A protein has these predicted regions:
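Structured catalytic-domain cores with a bias toward divalent-metal coordination
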Residues: 1-104
Length: 104
């Protein structure tokens, strides 16, 4: 993954993960992007999940490299249908938001 990030040089990174404490976790210059997504899924926006995460994607890409990075921490225990219904619009908005933002 490190080599992919280095070679692809992404302008932003969006990842999804399941966690007991659902949230829109932002790293690097991603706060406005995260707040836009949180408005759709009503998850809190966080910059820290409460414990050290050395080696995680957000720490590496967001904090160390300065790439806007969001980890959408999806609520555990939701059915597949509920995850799709809630998060497909969030993922779509993530892409649309980024397209608008980078155009400014």
């Amino acid at each position: 993954l490190v080599e992919l990030i280095r070679s692809a040089a992404p302008a932003a990174i969006l990842s999804a993960h399941s966690f007991n404490r659902y949230q829109v976790n932002v790293n690097g210059p991603a706060r406005a992007w995260g707040e836009a997504l949180a408005g759709l899924c009503h998850y809190p926006v966080t910059e820290d999940i409460g414990y050290p995460t050395p080696g995680c994607l957000g720490t590496y890409a967001g904090r160390e490299l300065g790439i806007p990075t969001i980890t959408l921490e999806i609520e555990r225990g939701l059915s597949r249908e509920a995850v799709i219904a809630l998060h497909l619009p969030v993922m779509r908005e993530a892409l649309l938001f980024w397209e608008k933002w980078k155009g400014n």
